[in-house]
């Protein structure tokens, strides 16, 4: 059907395609031998056209969103329908006949499932079940009411003579029409309401209704259709009963199919540990299988997919890997948005078909009025009943929005196209009326609902971050209410929910979740986990702000902060610890977090220098090779380490040099050099960097003890520097290992002798060395208070290790060429962590953090860390001494 | 339910209880029925044992605390008025100021907001008392830890639990005294749609 529908998209191509396609097909000719060039349009035609259409739709979407003003006023669905109209007009003009319409087969088999799956999978299940009563009422009673009243009223209109007699339809025909036109359409509702942002309860009621009413629509449509085909004379009483029974069969059967597949899906994903790569595929395959199965058994397919998505989510999310989760999310969103776009566009195109149009003003106007009127009436009546039972009644404003939000869409259109003209003589009139209704609801109501919501001051949805308190209190409330219901002896909603949760915990989760996932599955814990990671990030962010507020404002600060931030964020993200950093992305609401992430990403892309690539032959289809990002991290690390090793060596030699030189001259040069460098870096005390401190430490550890002492005697600053380094590190680490650290020669030990368990588990870490392990241990354990200490350390180390020169730092890029140029760019990298050191927590806390962190190769690691932690000494220095001091160090570090 | 009429006569001080708690006659009857069902030996009061025998309450992580809330000041028994008084905390508020509430007659927005506020404060009080074991008007870190121990179902170590408790207290603690006061507690609840979360419809 798609082939048929799209076969003429090639119109623009037709001219080009026409002639060459003839060639291979012309019979009778002897084969012309080997062809250099063959044009095989017909072999690729169908998929090619499909791809082209999707491309057109996507491009249209891009164009619409170029202007924020337009999209904020006009819903995308309206724009797409209008675009469809234009495209349809063009097609009509070129081909002289209407083509590429929305085919019911295509619609039901390919376009609808992704949208429904997406909405079912991402349905806020708690909210949905909290309002299940209302949703079901509106979906079942409301739809039945709409169908019968609209059909009957139209029939009455005809009897009154207001519909032209050429519309040959009896009561049954009108009921059939009423049944297909009465259903609120999930696609249209979703498209419009997603942009309106009404409060959650209102949204879930309207949207849930549109999803669940499918069963009713299908049943009504089928029953009426078969009645019409049988002829009203032959319909017997048992048929009516069967009709009622089929309502239950179709809806419950559909839901059951969905749940069965949800169960299968959850169970399957439990065993995919070794084949992570197919996890996303499984989700889509089984959900689609649920849809097709339900469709095959003529059950409610929409209900099946909704239930499948709703049911499996919890377990699937727990089972599949973090990357698979992201993949599922994005693929689902992409498919749904793609399908939605195509649907609306094809709807527009379908309207441009003069052969369909059999206009009858009475019918069209009558339908429009009745639809709006009965929807409103139905909503008011049902809400009145429901409010007798609801704790929080739906007020008038809610009712207005609900009535007005009853949009009709592609489902109605597809159903009306499916009618059999020989059985339903008035089909053409119905089609025309449906098109008008769909266009009216999507365009007029879609356009006006936003201003209406604003004008009525409907409570909007507010998105706030989850907090531990909220999560905890929510759970307590649930338990309290369940307990009170127990005491009262009334088995109400809370009671059953509590029961279900216990059942789920005891049996279902055990069966459907991986052991590892099941153990750590707790919502409070989850929130805690995420909060901590977010805090970690924001802490790094804040470090930047604090820094700039302390008066040490340097032009390069922000950029360097962001480097630190990105590298840490990146590391966290790569760590694969199962934490989703983007809290908000999970929800459908787009937030600033995404943008922030994107900005970070670009910054990282731009800021990281591209390391030499080593091409590895990695073409395993079953396992994802490590990311380019990870490889880059590794490369950056390795290069940094290499450089550091060199610098260590060279500083050693330097020391020998400097020692032999007369002091005064040295100071002079020092000053000059220092000034030059500092000036170059931006005229402030910017000479500090870990190389310098490292150099100082190295002077201590270097073999020439006597020279060392000599220098400390003669040079106060130098002496101070040494002392401070030692004290600062000891303070931070609380180990009294200062002397040890000074004795250890860091360079050979930078690559840890034995991989820690984290390294074994997380292969990417092996390249990062102990520091990365340090980070990971902190993040996975999540120690709230002392985490900050951990962060101080890890950040500083990360900075020095993994942050490459950032081309966004103007100073760095405009550094004058220096004898030891390779080291130069790194020199200032250490500054931003200084203020952070003032965050240092009480020793006991720091200690606690340490003891909790990875303890395998702890002590040596710490010692290795110390050169990197050299920035600590900065806090103890008054600015004045700092200047000269840095100069000295700089001199040493940079001298050749 | 045939015994309902006979119960009506049995409720001692039915009217005064009703006035005090605002329960309707029907709910009061229902509660009395329940009270008598829980009261095993027809002793006219409930002991802790009686409530502990409710099966579902035993699995409820907060079950013990709920039971405890029926026995203020360490008393061993609760009579029917006391029983009803505790449950009255979970009654939807609307009855008092909107005796004549009716969809036809919309109340002014103000009163509705007032009502919501009442409900909010009441909800907070209910919950707060559940946390605040020593009744000092503050949820200390220790108290938070105890609740968390009940609530967090997964296998976390004591240390991790302590961290969560620290974190939770820190999050809500605004004046930095290391404990969550009632005001701070209500603030942390403000973002939730609390008004519908602490009432049981059946207790009208």
Curated annotation (Swiss-Prot), chain A:
Phosphorylated by PRKAA2; promotes its accumulation at the cell surface. Phosphorylated by CSNK2A1 in a manner favoring its beta-arrestin binding and endocytosis. One of its GO terms (cellular component) is plasma membrane. Residues 854-864 have a biased composition (Polar residues). It is found in: Cell membrane; Recycling endosome membrane; Cell projection, Dendritic spine membrane; Synaptic cell membrane. The chain crosses the membrane at residues 46-66, 74-94, 104-124, 135-155, 174-194, 201-221, 247-267, 277-297, 332-352, 361-381, 399-419, 429-449. Signal peptide: none annotated. Keywords: Antiport, Cell junction, Cell membrane, Cell projection, Endosome, Glycoprotein, Ion transport, Membrane, Phosphoprotein, Postsynaptic cell membrane, Sodium, Sodium transport, Synapse, Transmembrane, Transmembrane helix, Transport. It catalyses: Na(+)(in) + H(+)(out) = Na(+)(out) + H(+)(in). Changing residue 709 to A: Abolishes SLC9A5 phosphorylation by CSNK2A1 and abolishes CSNK2A1-mediated binding of ARRB2. GO terms for biological process: monoatomic ion transport; potassium ion transmembrane transport; regulation of intracellular pH; sodium ion import across plasma membrane; sodium ion transmembrane transport. Residues 67-73, 125-134, 195-200, 268-276, 353-360, 420-428 are extracellular. Glycans are attached at residue 199. PANTHER family: SODIUM/HYDROGEN EXCHANGER, SODIUM_HYDROGEN EXCHANGER 5. This is Sodium/hydrogen exchanger 5. The lineage of its organism: Eukaryota, Metazoa, Chordata, Craniata, Vertebrata.
